[in-house]
């Protein structure tokens, strides 16, 4: 193997192994990512993402951006975030919008509670689009969703997908929120490649069982939009049996 072949192989390996928290993708996603790496200069590409505490700030996504050399890093993730909206979730940028909070400790503060109810994927995506439209960030070439572990109301993928009008989808379920966000990014940025990272395992067997149900629903939503799924649950190296 010559140096050029080693270089190409290493780039492929970086994409598959290091891209998206070092977790492996479905075969379809791996093939697509490998093909992209060989042809594309990442220094001319822009990376966007949304998620919860695992993604918020400069964590795995910043590592991906730095290693692969993306031009920009646009991250709207917030700790404690969910896919599902609340019945009183506000529209980002609306007249009465009070902001977003990743707080999780008990509180009676009504404004703080409203901010927490705004900490959902739909509002994050509205914020992301607004920041692109106002010139704060460029149009993304890659966008990764990585959330779901905090959702409790899963819903059914079939219910979320059967509604033809996007704004009529029930966004108070994880399934509905995921469909709205994925479809919105795809339609707003048609040249952007979208990926979804599944929730990872934890030290709780019951929580892991619930996550598997969520993953099945998210996978069905992604299949409907031809969005590759990154299997972080199976490949993250974390298992309940290893927790002490």
Question: What are the language-model segments listed below?
Answer:
Residues 1-9:
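Short, Lys/Arg-enriched N-terminal segments with co-localized hydrophobic residues
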Residues 11-16:
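Sec-dependent signal peptide recognition
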Residues 27-31:
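Boundary at the C-terminal end of the N-terminal hydrophobic targeting segment
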Residues 43-49, 54-168, 172:
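Conserved SGNH/GDSL esterase-like catalytic core that processes O-acyl groups on lipids
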Residues 146-153, 179-215:
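Active-site segments of SGNH/GDSL-like serine hydrolases
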Residues 199-244:
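Catalytic His-Asp segment of secreted/periplasmic serine-dependent ester chemistry enzymes
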